[in-house]
Design a protein with these regions (language model features):
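Short acidic-glycine loop/turn motifs at beta-strand connectors
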Residues: 32-34, 107-108
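Short, well-ordered amphipathic alpha-helical segments that serve as non-catalytic structural scaffolds
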Residues: 9-12, 54-62
Length: 121
């Protein structure tokens, strides 16, 4: 799967975002090493601590189905700024991603790719 195809899957997931409080929709598409794609969106709650980010939704969906090896994740948002993983997502990602797992975001009209080790430094 190409990066553009993975981003397209993330954009599909963004459409399911439940974000009535922030109005900031996020979608993610997670590519496993065996080629499966798991999507997720952000799901807000009036108790903000109960909110789940798109990245964690996709990761938890994959892990709950027995998949724990990943190649890449694409993250998109409804705003003009790139959607970078928050601290909690980075912590969860560090549990399941290898240092070379790719994180793909839309930035400046194109795609920017980071590795897991790059976003942790």
């Amino acid at each position: 799967m190409t990066d553009n195809e993975l981003v397209a899957k993330a954009k599909e997931a963004l459409e399911y975002s439940y974000s009535p409080y922030s109005h900031f929709a996020v979608g993610a598409a997670l590519l496993s090493t065996d080629g499966q794609v798991f999507t997720g969106c952000n799901i807000e709650n009036s108790s903000f601590g109960a909110t789940n980010c798109a990245e964690r939704t996709a990761i938890f969906k994959a892990v709950s189905e027995g998949v724990k090896d990943f190649k890449a994740i694409a993250i998109v948002c409804s705003g003009d700024q790139p959607a970078y993983p928050c601290g909690i997502c980075r912590q969860v990602m560090s549990e399941f991603f290898n240092p070379d797992t790719r994180i793909i975001v839309e930035e400046g009209g194109g795609l920017k790719t980071y590795t897991m080790s790059e976003i942790l430094t």
